């Protein structure tokens, strides 16, 4: 990580949840401590959190897709508020930016504002995805990484790697030890939103 000056971390909402519901505070504290080690070495860290622990709107045919995605955006904001508070409790300075106004809970995203927070040594949480329906938080993280000249994107999902099919559905799914983003796209592996991967 010595040559990486800025990284954007994507955390799956599902990965942060306990099986019985709620948040896995021990896991989040562990992540916070790992992030603190990186920040203390001078690396800027941005965080995007999915909303899957609250909402999987695409699985509900009774709700309009736009409305379902808006609910998902709100779920990411709730996750960022919670996780940023756990990060603060572990000695990190944080701030939350969203692509739309949220009153006093967050600040409106701008590249200048994010860079100002990074200069102050803050972990910057990017909530609300892109602010538009039909785009996942995977797309949101790529967008923020491009806008902010990030050196790397790290994905922490609710699964331990990339498989040739969904291991939750197919117990014989083959795990890849190494795979390029080109192969992920060509094989339609679904580990990341296709819009984000291209």
Regions found by a protein language model. Give the residues of each.
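Loop/turn-to-beta-strand initiation segments
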Residues: 42-46, 121-123
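Active-site phosphate/oxyanion-binding loops
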Residues: 58-66, 101-123, 133-198
């Amino acid at each position: 990580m010595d040559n990486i000056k800025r990284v954007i971390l994507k955390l799956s909402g599902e990965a942060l949840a306990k099986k019985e519901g709620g948040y896995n505070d021990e896991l989040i504290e562990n992540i916070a401590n790992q992030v603190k080690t990186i920040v203390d070495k001078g690396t800027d860290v941005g965080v995007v959190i999915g909303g899957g622990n609250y909402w999987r709107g695409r699985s509900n045919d009774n709700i309009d897709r736009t409305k379902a995605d808006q609910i998902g955006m709100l779920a990411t904001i709730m996750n960022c508020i919670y996780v940023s508070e756990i990060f603060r409790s572990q000695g990190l300075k944080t701030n939350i930016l969203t692509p739309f106004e949220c009153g006093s809970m967050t600040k409106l995203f701008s590249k200048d504002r994010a860079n100002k927070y990074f200069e102050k040594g803050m972990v910057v949480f990017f909530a609300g995805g892109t602010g538009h329906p039909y785009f996942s938080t995977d797309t949101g993280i790529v967008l923020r990484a491009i806008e902010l000249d990030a050196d790397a994107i790290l994905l922490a999902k609710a699964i331990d790697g990339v498989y040739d099919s969904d291991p939750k559905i197919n117990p014989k799914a083959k795990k890849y030890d190494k795979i390029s983003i080109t192969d992920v796209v060509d094989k339609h592996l679904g580990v990341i939103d296709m819009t984000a991967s291209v």
